């Protein structure tokens, strides 16, 4: 963070440990004299000592939790040298630090246990293989309407330019809202307003990735997976958790989800995005420009038929707009990450699909009676 430590990068475990120690020492200062003997205060003293690695004097003077400037060795002459404690006031200057400390503790950001080999889109590719010719590619939906109790979808073959119509008992619409708002439909006004509100709430997310011809973050800095955070525009650098100790590797050189920064990066040329990401990465890893190669960027707001990374409804829209989409419009049902409280996650899309299928099955059974 440019606002703290003179802009020098810091190891997360050190800052986390010193934050806990500094906060625990402040809290311990509020204990009543003689807390060692009294019941509740004695228990609180024990809690704070364990939480913050405080000494018997209830002060924080650094901890092995923060790591070592010189790691412990084998002989009595090599006990290891701990890092000195970072001043709590200096830690507090880092504007990005609150979100960093809480990130891994939020309910949807637990430590990753499994990941699909080949990238997250491996899941979509597996569905495509299973469905085979059922999928019609290059088919652009241009209209959705009710025809009695059924639905009619109008679509255009993008390769041949020909128009087509498909009638169905039910339609599961997973089209992202920024795209859906421009498709002709006979949805009622509350549904159209909800679609428009959601379309405005999409995050213009941006990612930048680089290839590295050697895994210098492992060999030079002992980084094996994980994330570096920065107050600069790139927001994060992700280090690969696969292919450890290999020859080459792919770094995620930027992951941007702040609307203003995302729009600014989206307006850049691909070449300019790479240059901006390298300049910011240089602050974390001096010599970065010579360590990365073959960059690529994706600005989701620029991707056709997507219009953004994911929706971020926010409390007002959750209450005012989202409910209008929950029950769909007759035979038309909506599904996707935007139809869940797990926005941006594939799990949200899958759960919403399950819910829609259950509603369709229930409706089909009621018709059969």
Question: What would you call each of these model-derived segments?
Answer:
Residues 1-369:
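FAD-dinucleotide binding site
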């Amino acid at each position: 963070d440019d606002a703290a430590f003179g802009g020098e990068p810091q190891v997360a475990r050190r800052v986390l440990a010193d934050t806990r120690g500094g906060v625990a020492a402040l809290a311990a200062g509020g204990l009543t004299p003689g807390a060692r003997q009294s019941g509740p205060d004695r228990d609180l003293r024990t809690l704070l000592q364990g939480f913050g690695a405080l000494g018997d004097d209830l002060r924080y003077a650094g901890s092995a939790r923060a790591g070592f400037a010189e790691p412990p060795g084998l002989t009595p002459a090599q006990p290891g040298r701990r890092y000195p404690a970072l001043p709590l006031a200096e830690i507090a200057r880092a504007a990005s630090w609150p979100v960093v400390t809480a990130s891994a503790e939020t309910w949807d950001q637990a430590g990753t246990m499994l990941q699909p080999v080949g990238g997250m889109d491996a899941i979509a590719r597996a569905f495509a293989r299973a469905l085979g010719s059922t999928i019609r590619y290059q088919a652009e939906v241009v209209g959705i309407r009710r025809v009695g109790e059924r639905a009619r979808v109008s679509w255009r073959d993008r390769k041949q330019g020909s128009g087509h119509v498909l009638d169905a008992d039910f339609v599961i619409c997973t089209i992202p809202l920024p795209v859906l708002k421009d498709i002709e439909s006979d949805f009622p006004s509350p549904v159209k307003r909800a679609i428009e509100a959601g379309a405005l709430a999409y995050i213009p997310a941006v990612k930048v990735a680089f290839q590295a011809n050697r895994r210098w973050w492992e060999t030079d800095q002992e980084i094996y997976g994980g994330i570096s955070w920065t107050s600069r525009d790139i927001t994060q650098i992700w280090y690969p958790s696969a292919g450890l100790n290999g020859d080459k590797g792919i770094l995620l050189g930027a992951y941007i989800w702040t609307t203003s920064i995302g729009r600014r990066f989206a307006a850049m040329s691909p070449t300019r995005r790479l240059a901006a990401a390298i300049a910011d990465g240089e602050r974390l890893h001096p010599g970065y420009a010579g360590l990365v190669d073959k960059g690529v960027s994706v600005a989701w707001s620029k991707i056709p038929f997507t219009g953004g990374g994911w929706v971020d409804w926010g409390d007002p829209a959750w209450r005012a707009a989202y409910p209008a989409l929950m029950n769909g419009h007759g035979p038309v049902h909506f599904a996707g990450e935007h139809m869940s409280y797990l926005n941006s996650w594939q799990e949200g899309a899958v759960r919403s699909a399950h819910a829609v299928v259950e509603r369709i099955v229930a409706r089909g059974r009621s018709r059969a009676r």
